[in-house]
């Protein structure tokens, strides 16, 4: 009842937020930080029902530990903000093609990272799609970055949610990261032979999430992930990288809340 009242107060507007604490931070397929980070996602908008949901999204990342002087002189890492459009195309009972189109700007300030632009603002388009169904859900994300960080990034995988007693659930998933030659250079560093990277997959992640849904508006979750660079050449280059978080294999986890109104 409380959830229905909260949703009714906002309708036809909506608000979503996911505050998290992560032991490490993977950004666009690259292990950017191997220390604890705070990540917050938020979205506010208007649900037209017929033509989808229009809104504004925000993504903030901050450090929970002291900064290393080679990378930061403040805790703030970066923020993203921009308009979004979401639309669900019903295909059959319990089947739907879910789309999420985003136009965003990423703001970095006083950030120094090997093989990546820093201390600037760049913009990008991103499309997320998934085929919701009762069985195995395939999903993908593709992002095209502009203004100094001109590269294409993608993520693709599958997941399955299992309901458990007492409003508990678990969701295993597996997905790969990859992109254009420039994105692989950003992820792995330069090729040892000096040639451009061939576009493709650079890493894979195995994820297991478990959570508890109090109601339709609030759930708590925890997760663990195994992140691995794939390909002998990729692993060799990443192992030689001077970047302080260039681990070929890394286990990370986190906890968080999901709020929807």
Model regions: which residues?
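Short glycine/proline- and aromatic-enriched beta-strand/turn motifs that initiate or cap beta-hairpins
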Residues: 10-70, 85, 252, 258-260
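Repeated loop/turn-to-beta-strand initiation elements of outer-membrane beta-barrel proteins
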Residues: 15, 49-56, 92-99, 133-140, ...
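Cleavable N-terminal export/targeting peptides
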Residues: 1-16, 245
């Amino acid at each position: 009842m409380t959830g229905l009242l909260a949703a009714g107060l906002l309708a036809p507007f909506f608000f979503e937020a996911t505050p998290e604490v992560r032991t490490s931070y993977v950004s666009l397929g690259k292990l950017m930080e191997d220390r604890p980070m705070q990540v917050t996602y938020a979205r506010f908008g208007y649900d037209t029902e017929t033509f989808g949901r229009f809104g504004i999204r925000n993504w903030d990342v901050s450090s929970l530990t002291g900064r290393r002087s080679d990378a930061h002189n403040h805790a703030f890492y970066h923020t993203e903000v921009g308009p979004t459009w979401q639309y669900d195309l019903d295909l059959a009972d319990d089947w739907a093609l879910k789309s999420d189109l985003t136009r965003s700007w990423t703001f970095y300030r006083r950030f120094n990272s090997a093989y990546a632009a820093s201390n600037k603002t760049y913009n990008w388009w991103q499309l997320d799609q998934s085929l919701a169904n009762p069985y195995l859900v395939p999903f993908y994300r593709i992002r095209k970055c502009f203004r100094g960080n001109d590269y294409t990034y993608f993520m693709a995988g599958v997941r399955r949610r299992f309901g458990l007693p007492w409003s508990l659930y678990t969701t295993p998933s597996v997905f790969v990261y990859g992109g254009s030659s420039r994105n692989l250079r950003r992820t792995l560093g330069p090729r040892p032979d000096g040639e451009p990277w061939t576009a493709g997959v650079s890493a894979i992640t195995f994820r297991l999430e478990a959570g508890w849904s109090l109601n339709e508006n609030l759930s708590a979750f925890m997760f663990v992930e195994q992140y691995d660079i794939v390909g002998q050449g990729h692993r060799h280059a990443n192992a030689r990288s001077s970047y302080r978080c260039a681990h070929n294999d890394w286990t990370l986890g986190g906890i968080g809340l999901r709020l929807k109104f």
